[in-house]
């Protein structure tokens, strides 16, 4: 991995894999003077490298990862499968969600058992480019899966395949279980670490399924939060004097109906020759009542308004007498 100092590819100006990027995503070091030497030895010991969603366009600079068995490169901008012969021990490779158009350069990975190429741009299926060691393969989201007898052709070409596009190859699971039972009876020594590979892959597939469900749940949660914000913004209280959209008639609450103008005018204590009749209405509610069209017509009877001048004249005559 010497010479990989910049994340920019020299040919196309794209983003490629570098020591710095691998270290940033997969390693943590205390600050000291021997950091570069420690980083070199630690990179050599890495077995799992995660470089998903980094905008990577080119696969390169993996020569220093001698013990690598799991490589996560999903969600990048990779267009070509290349430069993987330097990691022959690779068993797990995720290239989902890239821009890959054809399957190539995978025969240099004799130990590859899990390959995820879902959500790419693969149109033509080249079955002779897949390693025979594959146990789990995912090509969903590519147009090549629409060709006739796609599933049958892939299963026939890969004799060890146990799962295709998230669907188990049932006949092989059943036959393998029977073979495993008979093998344990005839050769009990083979039930140890030699046959532990399938259990590892089951756990690996379950972990990927959990990650998928977690991402879907997170996206759903964000969507629901956005939906909850919308009614909060639209159901804000109206400003005084502003009617609701689509409401042509003024609405009167029970509290407003009790504090109407006729009660204050017809009350003997409120009537006076010097002061105009008024009602005790809160300032905000008063603006709302008088700002709406037709409030006075609907809440103040004409007879009660007309009685106010006559009451004043009667009081004036009595004072003269």
Curated annotation (Swiss-Prot):
GO cellular component: sperm midpiece
Superkingdom, taxonomy of origin: Eukaryota
InterPro entries per the UniProt record, alphabetical: Cilia_flagella_integrity, Leu-rich_rpt, Leu-rich_rpt_typical-subtyp, LRR_dom_sf
Residues in LRR repeats: 45-66, 67-88, 89-110, 111-132
GO BP terms: maintenance of cell number; single fertilization; sperm axoneme assembly; sperm flagellum assembly; sperm mitochondrial sheath assembly; spermatogenesis
Domain LRRCT: 142-184
Gene3D superfamilies: Ribonuclease Inhibitor
Subcellular location: Cell projection, Cilium, Flagellum
Positions where Phosphoserine occurs in the chain: 175, 182
Start and end residues of each stretch annotated as Disordered: 235-321
Keyword match Cell division: no
Main location: other
Coiled-coil regions listed in the entry: 198-222
Keyword field: Cell projection, Cilium, Coiled coil, Differentiation, Flagellum, Leucine-rich repeat, Phosphoprotein, Repeat, Spermatogenesis
Entry function: Required for normal spermatogenesis and male fertility. Plays an important role in sperm flagellum biogenesis.
Protein name: Leucine-rich repeat-containing protein 46
Native source organism of the sequence: Macaca fascicularis
């Amino acid at each position: 991995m010497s010479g990989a100092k910049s994340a920019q590819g020299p040919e196309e100006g794209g983003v490629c894999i570098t020591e710095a990027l691998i270290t940033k995503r997969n390693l943590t070091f205390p600050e000291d003077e021997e950091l570069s030497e420690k980083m070199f030895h630690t990179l050599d010991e890495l077995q799992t490298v995660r470089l998903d969603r980094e905008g990577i366009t080119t696969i390169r600079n993996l020569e220093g990862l001698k013990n690598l068995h799991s490589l996560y490169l999903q969600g990048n901008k990779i267009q070509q499968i290349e430069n993987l012969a330097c990691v022959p021990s690779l068993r797990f490779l995720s290239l989902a969600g890239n821009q890959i158009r054809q399957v190539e350069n995978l025969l240099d990975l004799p130990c590859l058992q899990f390959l995820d190429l879902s959500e790419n741009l693969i149109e033509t299926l080249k079955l002779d480019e897949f390693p025979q060691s594959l146990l789990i393969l995912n090509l969903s989201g590519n147009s090549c899966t629409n060709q006739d007898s796609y599933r049958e052709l892939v299963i026939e070409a890969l004799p060890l395949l146990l799962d295709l596009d998230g669907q188990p190859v049932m006949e092989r699971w059943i036959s393998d279980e029977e073979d495993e039972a008979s093998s344990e009876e005839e050769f009990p020594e083979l039930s140890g670490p030699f046959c532990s590979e399938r259990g590892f892959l089951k756990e690996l597939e379950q972990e990927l399924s959990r990650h998928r469900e977690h991402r879907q749940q997170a996206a759903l949660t964000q969507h629901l939060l956005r939906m909850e914000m919308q009614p909060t913004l639209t159901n804000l209280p109206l400003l005084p004097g502003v009617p609701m959209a689509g409401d042509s008639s003024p609405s009167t609450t029970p509290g407003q109906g009790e504090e109407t103008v006729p009660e204050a005018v017809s009350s003997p204590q409120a009537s006076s020759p010097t002061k105009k009749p008024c009602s005790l209405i809160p300032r905000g509610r008063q603006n709302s009542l008088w700002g709406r069209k037709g409030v006075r017509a609907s809440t103040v009877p004409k007879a009660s308004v007309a009685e106010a001048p006559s009451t004043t004249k009667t009081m004036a005559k009595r004072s003269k007498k």
